[in-house]
Amino acid sequence: MRSSCVLLTALVALAAYYVYIPLPGSVSDPWKLMLLDATFRGAQQVSNLIHYLGLSHHLLALNFIIVSFGKKSAWSSAQVKVTDTDFDGVEVRVFEGPPKPEEPLKRSVVYIHGGGWALASAKIRYYDELCTAMAEELNAVIVSIEYRLVPKVYFPEQIHDVVRATKYFLKPEVLQKYMVDPGRICISGDSAGGNLAAALGQQFTQDASLKNKLKLQALIYPVLQALDFNTPSYQQNVNTPILPRYVMVKYWVDYFKGNYDFVQAMIVNNHTSLDVEEAAAVRARLNWTSLLPASFTKNYKPVVQTTGNARIVQELPQLLDARSAPLIADQAVLQLLPKTYILTCEHDVLRDDGIMYAKRLESAGVEVTLDHFEDGFHGCMIFTSWPTNFSVGIRTRNSYIKWLDQNL
C-alpha cells in the first residue's frame, strides 16, 4: 500500500512538472492554458516520434491527431444549414444563416482557418462552432475554406486555393444561388488564415477582372512577416503557449519547404542582417521602433546583426514575397484595401505583426479598428466551449462578431 502511494505521488509530481510552465499573471485562465499547452506539446512529441521512426511526416501525424479528436460532420440545425461542397475544386464548408425578413439578400464572410499552413481543418469542431455562431448571429452565409496543407503542398499553393475558392464564390451566379449581397462580403481568417486573408485582400485589389470587390477584411492575430523574429512581442512571449517563437519559425520553414538548419539563424535575425542586400529594401516597412506605440516597445531593443547568413534569403526568396509577408507590401497596394479589423493578443508572439500592419494601413489611408486583448493568447478565439472554454475566447469571439455586425 505504501509503495503504491509513493508511486502515485511520484506520477502526480511528474505530471505537474510536465504541465506547469510559468505564465504572466494577466493571461486568461492560466491553469487551463497550461493543460491545453501540455496536451498540444504531448501531441507534438508523439508526432515527432512517429516522424523519427519513419512512419509518417510529423506534421501529417500531428494533424491526424488534431482532426481525429475534433472532426465534426456537416450537421445542420434549425437556424443554420451546413453543407460540404467544393468551389472550383477547392473543398469548402458553407454555413447558411437564417434570412432577415427585411433583407432578402444576406451578407457573407469567407473564412480561412489557422494552423501554421499545416494543421487544423474547416471541418473540426472549433471552426465549425465559430462559423455556425457567425452565420446565426449575423444572418449570414459563411464560407469556410478547406485549403491544402503542408507537407502535401507548399507556398504559394495555399494562397492559390483560397484565391480560387473565393473567386468562384464571387461569381454573380454563385452569389445569387446563396442569396448573398455582392456589396457585403468580408474576407477573414485567424493566424496563418489571417496571413492568407491579408494576402488575398492585397491580390484582389490589383485584380481588374473582379466585378465584385470585398467590403471588409478582418484579421485575427495574423502572422504577417518572417524577417524579424525579435520584435518586442517575440522577445516578450518567446516561450508563451500555444505558439513559442521556435515553433513559429519552424512553421515558416515548413511553409517554404526549407531547411531546418536555418531555424536557429532565423531566430536571431541572421537572415536579415545588414549585409543581406536583398532585405534592405523592405527593412523600413517593419521597423517596429517607429511603427509600435511606446507602450508596446517598452525597454526592448532591436536585434540587428551586422553580418549574417545571406544564403537563407537566397534559398528562400519567399521570405521577401508580399504574398507570404503582407506587412512588407508597397503602400500603393495597401491604400487600395477595404476597411479593416485586426485583433491582437498581449501574450502572443504575433501581437506586433498585427499592430504594425494596422499602423501601415492607417498611414496608407485605410480605416482600421485595432482590437487588443490584454489577457489574450494566440489561438484563444476558437476556444469557447467545454473543456477548452476560456473567458478571453468568448470575449474575443463576441467582439469580432459585433464588429462584423456593425460594419458588414
From Swiss-Prot:
Topological category with respect to the lipid bilayer: Single-pass type II membrane protein
SUPFAM superfamilies linked to this entry: alpha/beta-Hydrolases (SSF53474)
Subcellular location as annotated: Cell membrane; Microsome
UniProt superkingdom: Eukaryota
EC number(s) stated in the UniProt entry for this protein: 3.1.1.-, 3.1.1.71
Active site as annotated: 191, 348, 378
GO cellular component: endoplasmic reticulum membrane; membrane; plasma membrane
GO biological process per UniProt: ether lipid metabolic process; lipid catabolic process; low-density lipoprotein particle clearance; xenobiotic metabolic process
Principal localisation: membrane
Sequence motif Involved in the stabilization of the negatively charged intermediate by the formation of the oxyanion hole, residues: 113-115
MF terms in GO: acetylalkylglycerol acetylhydrolase activity; phosphate ion binding; serine hydrolase activity; sterol ester esterase activity
Catalytic activity: a 1-O-alkyl-2-acetyl-sn-glycerol + H2O = a 1-O-alkyl-sn-glycerol + acetate + H(+); 1-O-hexadecyl-2-acetyl-sn-glycerol + H2O = 1-O-hexadecyl-sn-glycerol + acetate + H(+); a cholesterol ester + H2O = cholesterol + a fatty acid + H(+); cholesteryl (9Z-octadecenoate) + H2O = cholesterol + (9Z)-octadecenoate + H(+)
Function statement: Hydrolyzes 2-acetyl monoalkylglycerol ether (1-O-alkyl-2-acetyl-sn-glycerol), the penultimate precursor of the pathway for de novo synthesis of platelet-activating factor. May be responsible for the hydrolysis of cholesterol esters (such as cholesteryl (9Z-octadecenoate)) in macrophages. Also involved in organ detoxification by hydrolyzing exogenous organophosphorus compounds. May contribute to cancer pathogenesis by promoting tumor cell migration.
The name this protein goes by in its record: Neutral cholesterol ester hydrolase 1
Species for this entry: Homo sapiens
Phylogenetic placement of the source organism: Eukaryota, Metazoa, Chordata, Craniata, Vertebrata
